[in-house]
């Protein structure tokens, strides 16, 4: 109550921010007459003037009024479009490192030109980030004439562009591209083998369109560049045959309940758990199929990979549904984005899940991949000096933007008042009753000439509604991932009188639905339209537009509540743009996923008390409130998952930054011999210490072991035993110096054969390659550690602290391995002639390029299955990385359980 009173007196933080910015808008408006008097050349010259002022030390913020006035005037001359005052406000919000919430149809694309121009004046580059290539290309081409008029260059960063074209795109003042491509380029730059191979500049200012989609919906999706791992497709096929024999039971076994089934599914956590009966049956079936030896347990360390296959297959069958989570097209399993309903070509689930789904669907199983480099969007976008974003729906996620990205959200008012009617939800007992009610509503609306947009949450649901509409004889268009190509055409004509369009979630985001249809699309369909034809099309459109407005504007029907209120608001936001009339309503049933998982018992009880009859709907504030609470529960759960993911990724991020900084320093120098000499001293000291403990008695020295180690690991045959026999007075210090000196002399003799320049080149290559190889193995080991770390909670330890502690030890061990392997490789190298070395170098580069091409955006599950706890017992012999694994698999230790330790 007190907060409400204070807000009334002083205004909210949002009101105060807008009040401050409106003063600047008045200054910009005051400059308009002076700008109108300038000639084109004088207006263009302003860019050079601003840049000169910045070079002399003027602050960018001081240029806002003048720079915005220049862009507004240029837009009037180039496009015939004048920025509204609210768009100027939006531009200032975006320059202030904030999120601007601007409703659909308020002209976000034009608003973005203001801060993009202002920040490009610094010459450090501006990255405009969109959700797909189509929008990046569209926005870049639409705004190019304006920026080029003002003397700014525009680049488009598309996937598949060759490196020189990418470098050119990044060198432009303003670059348009997708979030994936910017992230991948960052990772690829950090896998480059020469400074010339890098394409990005320093990350300066990112302006993110549909910021909620990229920074929140995509936050759990790490970008992963991967290379091929071992082929285990046959194992996926074998395990897949076993799963149909298992029976699902409703809940997990406990002290009070023992079911008859073999596995239970936790829909909320998206986990599958085997019961005792299930484990026994699985083991029997695996033995029958000859996959596992009789008498073995699925949980024994030797079967850890088999357990991984079983878990992946179970999840593929129990949690992932065709036409909801993925579609099968041209013999390929393609993921469907749960937030937008779009297909995500080229993305694959990780942890063998994608292969398990391929086995389930009987399509070709593609090889598993090994991570070479990865980063989450959360950590990538936090690398920018300055970050801002815009969307139609950010207010519900304001807390997350603030706590994770340190970005405040400012709600920018609409240019015209919003008059859309949002009606209360209608709740039915069954799905069938709900669908019937939707059909009746559509009939009523279309009879009056009102266009209808039906939003569904999956392809499967959109096809159910489509079938019912076909039965009822209602003509309609379906917009889902299967009909991706015709998306823009369908959206353009969704505002026709009595048009019915079914859309999965919000496929088609970024394109406005014009009431009466799009006259621009009709003009574009003609080859060489005459002025008369264009006038006639416009006149016809005006008649249709007025008819649709009179009928009540676009009507939105939601067939189900989404987990997030934000996605529901996006659907509603398709109607009522720019002050147009419109209406919206959600139809729900007790069989909907959200209601079943989160709100079923309370709401079902409420509905029974109110005496529900079949076909009857309930429309009550209590029910709407219960649903909103359910959504809040899911949102806060998802926020916790994302926050936890970030806390864990922050540990990896610190290590990533250290490795990439080190790598870039290596790339930028041509001579690393000083580093090599320093490392050699450390490595030889540690090697000798292992066999001759410092300040120890001669009886404790293991001379034979030292000789063998020097020969095997450093190709150095030294008669140490003879030296000691011949020279009884040989001290430990002198012996150490002699061994190191011998190593240095042997290395120098090799250098004399190939020449210093070639040796420096080779040293750098070995360091980079070894660093990449060990970093790749370290990423896999961190993955395993992350998956099983939650089990430490049972020992009353904080999993996050344990993860930090262990990952730091692993990182330190990796750096020691790096030193050792670099010196070992350089010592053992066979000297060849310069031409041969150059040929091998070329071959290595080609291999590196091939791996970099095999990029893959992986969907990391939020609920990674826990790995077996294989903590090494203290006191056991330390196994060498290249020794056979003690588990008996026949693999090298580093490729088997060494990845887990």
UniProtKB/Swiss-Prot annotation:
It is found in: Cell inner membrane; Cytoplasm. The lineage of its organism: Bacteria, Pseudomonadati, Pseudomonadota, Gammaproteobacteria, Enterobacterales. Monomer and homodimer. Part of the essential Sec protein translocation apparatus which comprises SecA, SecYEG and auxiliary proteins SecDF-YajC and YidC. NCBIfam families: PRK12904.1, secA. Gene3D superfamilies: Helical scaffold and wing domains of SecA, P-loop containing nucleotide triphosphate hydrolases, SecA, preprotein cross-linking domain. SMART domains: SecA_DEAD, SecA_PP_bind. GO terms for biological process: intracellular protein transmembrane transport; protein import; protein targeting; protein transport by the Sec complex. Keywords: ATP-binding, Cell inner membrane, Cell membrane, Cytoplasm, Membrane, Metal-binding, Nucleotide-binding, Protein transport, Translocase, Translocation, Transport, Zinc. Residues 852-901 are annotated as: Disordered. It comes from the Bacteria. Its cofactor is Zn(2+). One of its GO terms (molecular function) is metal ion binding. It catalyses: ATP + H2O + cellular proteinSide 1 = ADP + phosphate + cellular proteinSide 2. This is Protein translocase subunit SecA. It holds the Pfam family SEC-C. The gene is secA. Its main location: membrane. May bind 1 zinc ion per subunit. Signal peptide: none annotated. It is an enzyme of class 7 (translocase). ATP binds at residues 87, 105-109, 512. Residues 891-901 have a biased composition (Basic residues). Zn(2+) binds at residues 885, 887, 896-897.
């Amino acid at each position: 109550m007190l907060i409400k009173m204070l807000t009334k007196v002083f205004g909210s933080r949002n009101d105060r921010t807008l009040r401050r910015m409106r003063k600047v808008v008045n200054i910009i408006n005051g400059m308009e007459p002076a700008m109108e008097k300038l000639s084109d050349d004088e207006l263009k010259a302003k860019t050079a003037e601003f840049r000169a002022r910045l070079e002399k030390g003027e602050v960018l913020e001081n240029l806002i009024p003048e720079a915005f006035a220049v862009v507004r005037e240029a837009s009037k001359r180039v496009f015939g479009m004048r920025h509204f005052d609210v768009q100027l406000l939006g531009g200032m919000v975006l320059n202030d490192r904030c999120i601007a919430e601007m409703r659909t149809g308020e002209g976000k694309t034009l608003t973005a030109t203001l801060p993009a121009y202002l920040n490009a004046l610094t010459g450090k580059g501006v990255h405009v980030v969109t959700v797909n290539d189509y929008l990046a290309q569209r926005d870049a081409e639409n705004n190019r004439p304006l920026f080029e008029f003002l003397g700014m260059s525009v680049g488009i960063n598309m996937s598949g562009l060759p490196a020189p074209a990418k470098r050119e795109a990044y060198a432009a003042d303003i670059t348009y591209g997708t979030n994936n491509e910017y992230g991948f380029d960052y990772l690829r730059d950090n896998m480059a083998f020469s400074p010339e191979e890098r394409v990005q500049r320093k990350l300066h200012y990112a302006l993110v369109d549909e910021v909620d989609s990229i920074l929140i919906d995509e936050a759990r999706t790490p970008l992963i560049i991967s290379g091929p791992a071992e082929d285990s497709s046959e194992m996926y096929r074998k395990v897949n045959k076993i799963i149909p024999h298992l029976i699902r039971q409703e809940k997990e076994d406990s002290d009070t309940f023992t079911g008859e089934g073999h596995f239970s599914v936790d829909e909320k956590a998206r986990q599958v758990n085997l019961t005792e009966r299930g484990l026994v049956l699985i083991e029997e079936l695996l033995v029958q199929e000859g996959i596992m030896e009789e008498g073995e347990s699925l949980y024994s360390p030797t079967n850890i990979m088999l357990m991984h296959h079983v878990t992946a297959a179970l999840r593929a069958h129990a949690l992932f549904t065709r036409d909801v989570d993925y579609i099968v097209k041209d013999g390929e399993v393609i993921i469907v984005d749960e937030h937008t309903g779009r297909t995500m070509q080229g993305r694959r689930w990780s942890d063998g899940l994608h292969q398990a789904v391929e086995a389930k669907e009987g399509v070709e199983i593609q090889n598993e991949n090994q991570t070479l480099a990865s980063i989450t969007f959360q950590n990538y976008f936090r690398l920018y000096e300055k970050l801002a974003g815009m969307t139609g729906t950010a207010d519900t996620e304001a807390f997350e933007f603030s706590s994770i990205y340190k970005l405040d959200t400012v709600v920018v008012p609409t240019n015209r008042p919003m008059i859309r009617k949002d009606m209360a939800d209608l709740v039915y007992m069954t799905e069938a009753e709900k669908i019937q009610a939707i059909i009746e509503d559509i009939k009523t609306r279309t009879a009056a000439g009102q266009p209808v947009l039906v939003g569904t949450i999956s392809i499967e649901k959109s096809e159910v509604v489509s079938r019912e509409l076909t039965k009822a004889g209602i003509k309609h268009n379906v917009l889902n991932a299967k009909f991706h190509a015709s998306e823009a055409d369908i959206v353009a004509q969704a505002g026709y009188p009595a048009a019915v369009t079914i859309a999965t979630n919000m496929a088609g985001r970024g394109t406005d639905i014009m009431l009466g249809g799009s006259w621009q699309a009709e003009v574009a369909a003609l080859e060489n339209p005459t002025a008369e034809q264009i006038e006639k099309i416009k006149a016809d459109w005006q008649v249709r537009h007025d008819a649709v407005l009179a009928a009540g504007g676009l009507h939105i029907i939601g067939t189900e509540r989404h987990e997030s209120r934000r996605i529901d608001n996006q659907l509603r936001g398709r109607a009522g743009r720019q002050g147009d009339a419109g209406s919206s309503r959600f139809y729900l049933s007790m069989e909907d996923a959200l209601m079943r998982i989160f709100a079923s018992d309370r709401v079902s009880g409420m509905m029974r008390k109110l005496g529900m009859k079949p076909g009857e709907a309930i429309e009550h504030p209590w029910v709407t409130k219960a649903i909103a609470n359910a959504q809040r529960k899911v949102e806060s759960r998802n926020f916790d998952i994302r926050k936890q993911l970030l806390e864990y990724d922050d540990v990896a991020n610190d290590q990533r930054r250290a490795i990439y900084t080190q790598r870039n320093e290596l790339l930028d120098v041509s001579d690393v011999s000083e580093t090599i000499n320093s490392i050699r001293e450390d490595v030889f000291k540690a090697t000798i210490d292992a066999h001759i403990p410092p300040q120890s008695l001669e009886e404790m020295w293991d001379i034979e072991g030292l000789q063998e180690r020097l020969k095997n690991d450093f190709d150095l045959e030294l008669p140490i035993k003879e030296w000691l026999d011949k020279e009884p007075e040989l001290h430990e210090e002198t012996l150490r110096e002699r061994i190191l000196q011998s190593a240095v002399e042997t290395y120098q003799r090799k250098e004399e054969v190939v020449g210093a320049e070639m040796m420096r080149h080779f040293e750098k290559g070995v360091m980079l390659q070894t660093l990449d190889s060990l970093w790749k193995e370290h990423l896999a080991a961190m993955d395993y550690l992350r998956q099983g770390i939650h089990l430490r909670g049972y020992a009353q330890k904080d999993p996050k602290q344990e993860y930090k502690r262990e990952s730091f030890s692993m990182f330190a061990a990796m750096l020691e391995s790096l030193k050792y392997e670099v010196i070992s490789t350089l010592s053992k190298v066979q000297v060849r002639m310069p031409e041969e070395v150059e040929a091998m170098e070329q071959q290595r580069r080609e291999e590196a390029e091939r791996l970099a091409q095999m990029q893959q955006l992986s969907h990391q599950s939020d609920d990674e299955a826990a790995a077996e706890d294989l903590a090494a017992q203290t006191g056991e012999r330390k196994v060498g990385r290249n020794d056979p694994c003690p588990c008996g698999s026949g693999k090298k230790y580093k490729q088997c359980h060494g990845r887990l330790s």
